[in-house]
Amino acid sequence: MAKKHLVIVESPAKAKTIGKYLGKDYEVKASMGHLRDLPKSKLGVDIEHDFEPVYQPIRGKEELISELKKAAKSSDTVYLATDPDREGEAISWHLKALLNLDDEKAKRVTFNEITKKVVSESIKEPRAIDQDLVDAQQARRVLDRIVGYQLSPLLWKKVRRGLSAGRVQSVAVRMVDDREKEIQAFEAQEYWTLDADLTDEATHKTFEAHYYGKDGKKVEPASGEQVDGIIADIGDKSFTVTNIKRTDKQRSPSLPFTTSTLQQEASRKLNMTPRRTMAIAQQLYEGVDITGEGTVGLITYMRTDSLRISEEAIAAAKTFILGRYGQSYYPKTARHYKAKAGAQDAHEAIRPSNVNLTPEQIKGDLTGEQYRLYRLIWSRFLASQMANAVYDSVSAQIMAGGHEFHASASNLKFSGYTAVYEESRDDDSKEEKEGTLPPLVEGQGLTLEAYTPLQHFTQPPARYTDATLIRAMEQNGIGRPSTYAPTVSTILDREYVIKDGKYLRPTPLGEVVTGLMEERFPDIVDMKFTARMEEKLDTVEEGKTAWKDVIRDFYGGFERDLENAEKALEGMRLKVPDEVSEEKCDVCGRNMVIKSGRFGRFLACPGYPECTFTKPLVIEMPGRCPKCGGRMMKRTGVSKKTNKQYTYYACEFSTSSDPEKKCDFMTWDVPTKDDCPECGQTMFKKAGKGFKRPYCINPACSRFVPEDQRGYVKKKTTETAEEGAESAEAADAAETAAKKTAARKTTAKKSTTAKKTSTKAASTKKTATKTAAAKKTTKKAAAEDGAEKPAKKTAAKKTATTKKTAAKKTTAKSAAKKTAEKEEN
C-alpha cells in the first residue's frame, strides 16, 4: 500500500500551488499562519522561571488544529513546509508540538521559490527543524512581549490610553523625531551661482557655462555683491575655450532587490506602502493562476537581505538577454554580487522564478498591483545581469580674464541595462540635465550673450519617506527584512507619525512619547543599542549564543529603568499639545487644531467655547481600493435628519477632478491591513460592535461575505443611505430616544417569540411560505406584547442596562492588556 504524506504550509494559495506539483500521495493543508503563540490576556513569559514562554493554542483555531491532528495521524510523514525564515521555522516548531509529531515523522522542507523543480527536490531532501533559528525567533518574540506588555501600561497611565512602545518601533519614531528637530534647528545660509550664456559663432548655437572660480581656485559667491564684483572684474574680456575633454563614462546597473530595496523602490516608483508591497510580493511568491501554466510561483522568497543569485538563474538570464537584445547587451563575464556586511545571506535576492515569463506575457492573469510589482522585480533582475550603459561625456574649460567657467554635456551612447530599467531617486530634485554642446575646439573664442546670477539658500535635511526611513533603518542595523514594513505601519497606526504628502513627520503625541522614552528608557530608543540587540539575535541563529542569555542581559537594565520611571512619574500625567493645522476656521479665521474624540480625530477651533466650529479630518486607512487600487480614506459627515456624525470609507480618488482618475467606491465597512488569502484584495470588517473578523467583499472571490451576513442590523427599506451609514459606524452610539424605545420594545419580546417559533420548527417541517408567515407573526406578536406590557419592557430595559454596565467594566480592565499585545513584529 502506497504511503500517505501530509504537507503543511501557511496559506491556501501556497497550498494550491504546491499541491499542483506533488502527486496524489500528498495532501497539502494550510495552517493559516501561527496556531500557537503567547496568550493575549497576560504577559505569557514566566520571568521568575528564567523567562520561560507560556504558549497556548490561538483562540478560534481549535477546529483547524483538530483537523490537522486528524490528517497527521493518518499520514506516514508530515512535511512542515512553512516559509524559509525565523518566523516560518517557529511555525513549524509549534506545529510539531501541537500535532505531537516525533522526529521520525516530522520533516522540515523549505522552498526559496515555488516551482515544480524546487518543490520536488526539497521534498526529496528534508531536514530536521533548525532549533537555532527557532530560538532566535523565540528571543525576539519574548523581548518584544516584555517591552510591549510592561512599558505600554506606563504610557497609558502617564500619557494616553491605547498607546504602545516597542523595541524597534520606538527607535523608528525617534529617528523621525530627530530629523524633525534637525529641520527646526536648521539655519539657512545664502549662496549665489553665476551662469554665462555663450554662443559659438561658427554654428550659432548658444549654451550655458557655470562659474567655477579664479586662478584655478574654486570660488563660491556668498552674496549678490560678490557676484557683481566678478562680473565687473571680467568686464569686456573675451571668453576663450582653453581645454576640451572627451571620455566614455560607464554606469553599472543597480543591484538585484533585497526586501529593503524592493520596499524603497516600490514606494518611489509605484507609490506602494511597504506593507502593501510585501502583501503583493507574498501573493507572487505563493502562486498565481497563469493561463496555460496553472498556479505558478512567480518570484523567489521576498524576505531576504541577500544579493546572491543562483547559477541556474544567471544562466537563464544570459540566454534571455542574448535572445532578445543581442551579444552587446551581455557583459563579458556573468555578474555575481557580494553579500553586504551583516547580511544573513540565507536566501537568494528577490528575482523572478522564471525570467522567460515576461510581465507583458502574463499581464492578463495578474491584478494591476501584481503586474506592476512583478514588472519591477523582473526588470530589476534582468538589468542586474546586463552590460553597462555608456555615455559620451564632453567637458569644456572656458577662461575670461583669469575667471574660469565650466560647461559639460553627456549623451547616451549605448543603452545597455537602461533598455530595461533605471532606478528612481529618493528626492524630488531632478538630475541636472546637461544639454548638448556645439563642436568646440581649444583656443576658439565665444560670444557672451548674458549673465544669469541666481540667489540660493542651503536646504535643511529632507524629512523621511517610507523609502528613506527603511533605508536608514537598514543602514543603522535597526530591525531585519521581516520587520521593516510592520514597523512603518505601526508608527503610522499609533499616530506617533503621520504622512505629510509622502513625507513622515512626528505628531505632538509622537514627540511627547519619544521625549519620555529618551529620558526614562534611553536604551530602548538608542539606535546603537537596538542594532547590538539585532546582532545578538543573529548570534543566536548561528548557534553561538543561548537565547535566554540575550533576555537576561537585557532585562536587568530594563527592569531598573521601569522601576525608576514609575517612581519619578508618580502622580504625573504628561499633556500632549494640540496639533495646529493649516486649516482656517470658517467662522473666526483661527488656525484649527487636531483633536481626538469618540469618532476619531477631527479639526476644531481653538477658540472654544466662544467658537464651537468643527470639521472632519480625512485620514488614510490601511488597504487599497478594490476598484482602482487607490488608497482608502476615512471620511465623516453629519446626518441632516439626526444631526449626528457618521463615518464612511472612500477611495482617495472619490473627490478627484480628473475624470480618468475619479473612482466612486465607498463603503461603511472598515478596511483592514489584511489581504484576502484567496483573491489578494483588501479585507474589511464590520463597523461598530460585534463580528470583528475580517471578510472579503469581492463578489468574484470564494471567500466573499454578502452584506446581509456581515452582522449589520437590517434597516427598513425606507431608511436613507445616510442614516444607514450613521448606524453602521456608530452602532454603539446613542440613537434618538424614539428609536431606542422602539428597538427595546421589539427586542424584549422578539427573544421569547423566537424561542417559541424554534420549538415549533423542531416538531414540524416548515416550508418557505410557513417560515415567512412565522416571521410576520413574530413581529406582530412582539409589537403587540411590547405595547400591552410596559412593566416587562421596563424590566428588560433595566436588565440590559445592568449587563451593559458590567460588560463595560470588564472591558476597561482588560483594555490595556489587549493594546499592549500589539507590539511590532
Predicted ranges, named:
Residues 1-138, 150, 212-213, 221-224, ...:
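Intrinsically disordered, low-complexity regulatory segments
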Residues 2-6, 17, 152, 185, ...:
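Basic, low-complexity terminal or inter-domain segments flanking catalytic cores
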Residues 17-21, 67, 90-98, 118-122, ...:
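Alpha-helical scaffold elements adjacent to nucleotide-binding pockets in ATP/GTP-utilizing enzyme cores
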Residues 118-195, 247:
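C-terminal or mid-to-C-terminal helical accessory/interaction module adjacent to the motor/catalytic core
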Residues 140-151, 168, 198-200, 249-261, ...:
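Core structural elements
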Residues 158-162, 177-223, 269:
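C-terminal helical "lid" subdomain and adjoining coupling/linker elements of P-loop NTPases
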Residues 218-255, 444:
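Metal- or metallocofactor-binding catalytic centers and their adjacent structured scaffolds
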Residues 261-273, 470-480:
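Short helix-coil junctions and helix-kink-helix linkers
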